[in-house]
Amino acid sequence: MVERSVDAGALPIAVRVYPDLKPSQPQRKAPQIDGMLVFDCETRTDRAQALTFGSYRFLVAGRCLEEGLFYADDLTAAERTMLERYAREHAADTDPRGIPERGIPSNPDLVLLPIADFRTLLYRVAYKGRGLLCAFNFPFDASRCALGYVESRDRFLGGFTFQFFHYRDRNGRLRVNPYRPGIAVKHMDSKRALKGFTGAIDPDKVDQIPEGDIKPKKGYVFRGHMLDLRTLAFALTDRSLSLEGACDLFGVEHGKQKVERHGIITPVYIDYNRRDVLASTELAAKLLADYALHTIELQVTKAYSPASIGKAYLQAMAVAPIMARMPDFPKRYCGHAESAFFGGRASARVRKVPVPVVYTDFMSQYSTVNVLMGLWNFVTAREIRVTEDCREELAALLRDVKPDWVLDASNWKRLAGFARIVPDGDVLPLRAKYRGNSWQIGVNYVHARSDGPKDGLWYAWPDLVASVLLTGKVPRIVEAFRLAPIGKAKGLKKLAFRGQVPIDPRSQDFFQSVIEERARLAARTDLSDTERDRLRRSLKTLGSATSYGIFAQMDRQESDKEVALTCYGIDPEPYRCKVKHPEAPGEYCFPPLASLITSGGHLLLALLERLVADRGGTYAMEDTDSMAIVASQRGGLVPCPGGPYTMKGGREAVRALSWEQVAEIVALFAQLNPYDRTAVPDSILKIEDDNFDPKTGKQRQLWCLAISAKRYVLFLRDRNGEPELLRKNVNNGEDGWSQHGLGHLLNPSDPTSEDRSWIAQAWLGIVRRSLGLATEPLPFADRVALGQITVSSPEVLRPFAKLNADKTYAQQIKPFNFILSCHIAPYGHPADADPEHFHLIAPYETDPRKWLALPWIDQYSGKQYRISTTLATGTRQIARVKSYGDVLEEYAFHEEAKCADASGAPCDKQTVGLLQRRHVTIEWPPRFIGKESNKLEEIEEGSVPDAGDVYTEYLDPRRQERDWHRVVETLRAMTKRQLRELEKRSGISLTTLKAWRRGRTAHSNNRAKLAGALRDGRFG
């Protein structure tokens, strides 16, 4: 076994499993939609955010035939009078021609409707007429127009069903009309939601005719054509855009305007709202026209993401999903590959020490890996053949690994395989609990608990090549297999992307063609600048969407019912288990491809790391496809604690490479360029534009300060050593600071503003302190650090049940309202609170002076508390919460827990300088989990306080019982004093511990809690 510098004890690890559930079904193409209703709402600015008024446009064949306003029932007489006067004095912006060929006139008058009449219009156009119902941020506007809601069931479970129609019963009470549909909305993330009409009692026969059919079908429910412009803009651009940003990007003539004051009905405010609807209407036309250029069969309302469009292109080329056309492909290989899946590398290597850098990144990393490894041949193969027992072949391959071997592009196609190894100091990605209760992936020296083959883990061959590059040793291989594509699937079809870029899946590598055609656009004279930019953006989006994510897609099911399923993982045989919220593989999910692609990305970074290290250098940070190499114009030693070099005077240092040396490394990667050199002539490793002055084009000295993974800043220094952050449209093309860990917080100076310059202020202070320069106190440091959360699910809304009691829907905190979230300081929990399950939320309020007095409610218990930023600790009724100053201080000291300091001990908050890899011993057995990326936005913003709450764990009953038996034996061997100490450490009562000793079974959560206490404590 390899000797370790520090053994910090065994860490719990987790590996992914492949759950054998039916993949999600592809969407059918919808018929041509003629009519469109576009609407937008304005609201009160109080905590209820109730509808005041809105406006709409009704279009047929692109011509506006009616424009109108609608208003809430509870307006004051003065507010209603204002709207009535406005409607009388302003004409509608309709097309005076109407549609004469159909005999449809337009209405020149600006219509004014009560909200009930607008709901009827919506029903008539969107349900009976099957027109397009359109808004920007659809869930919010739909929820404003509703008269109530219930929690959704079945396909929309985890969402809300909004009610739009009611009637009065015999006693005069309002009742929901069951003969009219509701609209169900299930939040996916800030850009996407599932939407659809719900079923109604005794629907008309015509409403039961499926799309594209002519006869009614019993049980059919028309779900509607509901388009969120924000979602479609995201699907087309892979960017999260505001209405203003989308209008600018797509060249809308009448874009969004601004208004000084919201919530008060004035003629100016009505103008503002009408302009929003006009902007939305013009944006819809632009987006729909852009979407129509894509030669795909996907209904526009089902284009939820770039991946949706990417999959539709595969379908258009008749590229069927691998598991659909090869249903007999052994799922155990999918399980082995899924357990070998790890996301991109991300870490800080030089911590909290500003160092000069050259910032580099790999061109379209995942697409490039696909081309290098020939993975398109797998996507289009007639058959994928598995060759087992490749241990000797793999060992021989690994013995040849050197940098030059990896730089030989012909070797990459030999790496389509997986192996189970017994780690013994090999440098490998490992998903472990390095700190706290969440899983993180670190690339470290991994050690098995024993030499036994059953203690082995599966890895993709590129990860093993990376380990050999970084350690010089071949791992102990227990099992190995490789994959090979055989032939081509039948029926593949060529197409023209957006009608302009021909792609033939039979003879071309799709991933390669997308990159090459994008590069060739600059030389095309047949395109306008606008169309060239749009085509370039579309090709980039398509390449990103199809090169990785669709092969890794797992869709979490929201049902709270336990589902029995079969899981494939690290073992030759699968196991059966029951879980809540299982994950179904996506339509194109194929774990071998997903794992090979990400491991190929790891290998590129490992090769870059090795080439830098061979020249005596290091890097400040790495992030998936980028690396900030410590480098200066002439190179030399740079002061850095923990560095391997010594400067005059005895200070520890790292070596900065020269710009020339970095350029030499970049040139080496030209050998791995798999593209047509007439289109892409240079290296796949790029020196980023940030390194060059945008005015002169000359290279400039960048500096980097990294705290931990994804928390770093790039900056310049003037002649006096003063730092200057990289700022978009000031001295750079993009901002040079990370928002990770801060982006969910409100602007402390103006909570209604989307301006994030306060984060730049914070980073500048961190940089100045690291340079030993004077720093001005932040003016907002003492304010409560608050985030804005959307009430996106019933579980977020339930804590407000007491606050909402006996109030009308308009007065309630409603679905898709904005609410506030704060963060508990260390030792700040109230005395009776469970720190593991405690999160305070409050009604939305824009006035910071009122934040401390709001009713703050624990999301778990529903109890109400007060908050303070000045108490030392929490009390029975008061929670000590973090101020912006507290958050930023923690941010600046956030440890890089998956790395080690110079001595080999785990990095902590005080660690400064050069980090190294940890030596990690695996705690066996591993935990078997699903994807880590469930509800990432909610975790970031705070509505899901603990990432562990959204992992799906697939317990293996075979291991579970063996492990529990060992725990029970340990309990039986403990003395009374040891049991009492265990009670304190675990929080599990002595009575329960004794019952388990006698043989009573325990819930899996309690088993995990007990195992953790036994692992962390010494009971002497």
Show the residue positions of the predicted features.
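Two-metal-ion RNase H-like nuclease active-site motif
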Residues: 34-44, 228, 358-360
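Conserved acidic
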Residues: 50-52, 57-103, 109-955
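A short, Lys/Arg-rich alpha-helix, primarily the initiator
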Residues: 956-975, 979
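Short alpha-helical DNA-recognition segment
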Residues: 975-994
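N-terminal accessory regions of nucleic-acid-interacting proteins
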Residues: 1-41
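DNA major-groove recognition helix of helix-turn-helix/homeodomain DNA-binding modules
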Residues: 1004-1020
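Residue-level detection of the helix-turn-helix DNA-binding "recognition helix"
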Residues: 998-999
